[in-house]
Amino acid sequence: MTESRPLGRFVGIGVGPGPARLLSVAAWEELQRCDLICYPRATSHESSAALHALDGLELPQAEWREISFEMSSDRDRLRKYYMELALSLRGELELGRRVGYLTLGDSMTYSTYGYLITALREIYPQLRHRTYAGITSFAAIAA
């Protein structure tokens, strides 16, 4: 990283359980500012539920990157995987880019985002980041 360029920003964006109209205004505005938007897809699925939660919305002109992951209860395997993922985003952050990461439901509730932000902060303790809450499926059902 060069000293003249500040480190980019990482944002976790909870997109809610779907449909798209359950995305918060603050999260939508942040999504518009992202240079790169990453979205998770379980290897056991053909498409990303988090990305589908945005169906019907006019998506921002940004670079989009699918992140595939396996569901695993092996903590060592998860830690290694998310550290590798964090390292793969290193170049984007060192270029000063704003990187968004979509999560289905809420970013901090049973989400891949929690693992990724932990790994990123191990690499960059000074990383500027923000987490945008999303509506969980159980909160949506209760409403």
Regions found by a protein language model. Name each.
Residues T118, T136-A139:
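Residues on a specific face of well-ordered alpha-helices
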Residues R130-T136:
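Active-site nucleophile and cofactor-binding loops and adjacent substrate-binding regions
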Residues I141-A143:
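Anionic-ligand binding region
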